[in-house]
């Protein structure tokens, strides 16, 4: 089960699966030269996010002390129309985890700078199918050749009951994740115009839209990402390694509220509990976990 969830984070990372029931991508306008097709999908996508998880103790290993985590993410993408509803999307993303607390030899930060290259089928700003590569450096401090990874994902959504229930299946992988390749998927159920279930990992959610501008999500989230470390010398004899791969993960659940009345921006604030934080040095068989702790999040997204 843990392997499936870890891999599914690559399958759907960076997406918020939503199904729009309208099927028209373009609208007709009359201009001086006749009828013109107007593209209804956004072409520029911007996102910035910060998440802070408060301090907690390391589970089962008191010599490692305690720690907290701060996550920051920035991304920008541009969609290029190919034909019909097919787009090529290209962009960049910078992510960074910072860890504070006891000086225990574990990484005090992990970061990645990578590109986005995707072929997508887009309806009303949501990708219903896609293939994406995210090549880049996934590292602690030093960018070396063995810090380069190419996470990839492929997915497709399809109706199970017209305008009501949709299925999502996918496959994803990366050189430094564990396992290297694994499946993912889930269901999306539209209860009404205002409420739906997005049962798709890594962000399953119950979503309520009281108005066009406000959205409330009861959401789970599974974050798994692998990095090349530098020197990791801890008080534990079993965890003294150099140039090792670590798969860091945070599993959490909480509530978040979004407001999109200031077009083209969407502002989101959230809070809840991070149930699991773990440093998994899976190639040497060592995984160190922290106790649960509260988290807080704020993000800003724009589509134009």
Identify what each model region corresponds to.
Residues 1-8:
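Bacterial N-terminal signal peptides
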Residues 17-149, 243-252, 285:
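Transmembrane beta-barrel domains of bacterial outer-membrane proteins
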Residues 46-54, 90-96, 131-137, 169-173, ...:
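Transmembrane beta-barrel strands of outer-membrane/channel proteins
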Residues 63-68, 107-109, 140-147, 172-181, ...:
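Solvent-exposed loop/turn segments connecting transmembrane beta-strands
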Residues 76-80, 119-121, 158-160, 173, ...:
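Residue-level signature of outer-membrane beta-barrel architecture
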Residues 82-88, 125-131, 163-168, 194-197, ...:
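Repeated loop/turn-to-beta-strand initiation elements of outer-membrane beta-barrel proteins
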Residues 96-105, 202-285, 289, 294:
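Outer-membrane beta-barrel translocator/channel fold
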Residues 185-189, 194, 255-263, 289-304:
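Outer-membrane beta-barrel "beta-signal"
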């Amino acid at each position: 089960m843990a392997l499936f969830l870890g891999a599914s984070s690559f399958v759907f990372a960076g997406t918020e699966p939503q199904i729009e029931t309208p099927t028209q991508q373009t609208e007709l306008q009359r201009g001086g030269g006749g009828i013109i097709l107007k593209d209804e999908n956004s072409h520029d996508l911007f996102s910035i996010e910060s998440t802070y998880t408060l301090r907690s103790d390391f589970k089962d290993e008191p010599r490692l002390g305690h720690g907290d985590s701060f996550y920051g993410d920035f991304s920008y993408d541009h969609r290029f129309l190919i034909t019909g509803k097919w787009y090529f999307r290209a962009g960049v993303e910078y992510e960074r985890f910072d860890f504070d607390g006891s000086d225990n030899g574990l990484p005090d930060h992990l970061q990645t700078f990578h590109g986005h290259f995707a072929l997508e089928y887009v309806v009303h700003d949501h990708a219903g199918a896609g293939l994406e590569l995210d090549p880049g450096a996934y590292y602690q401090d030093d960018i070396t050749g063995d810090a380069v990874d190419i996470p990839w994902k492929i997915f497709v959504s399809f109706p199970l009951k017209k305008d009501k229930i949709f299925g999502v299946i996918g496959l994803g992988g990366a050189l430094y994740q564990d396992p290297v390749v694994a499946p993912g998927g889930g269901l999306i159920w539209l209860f009404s115009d205002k409420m739906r279930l997005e049962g798709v990992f890594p962000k399953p959610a119950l979503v309520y839209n009281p108005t066009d501008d406000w959205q409330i999500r009861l959401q789970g989230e599974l974050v798994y990402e692998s990095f090349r470390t530098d020197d990791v010398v801890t008080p534990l004899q079993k965890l003294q390694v150099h140039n090792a791969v670590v798969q860091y993960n945070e599993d959490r659940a909480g509530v978040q509220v979004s407001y999109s009345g200031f077009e083209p921006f969407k502002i989101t604030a959230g809070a809840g509990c991070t149930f699991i934080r773990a440093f998994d040095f899976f190639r040497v068989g060592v995984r160190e976990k922290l106790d649960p702790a509260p988290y807080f999040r704020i993000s800003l997204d724009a589509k134009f």
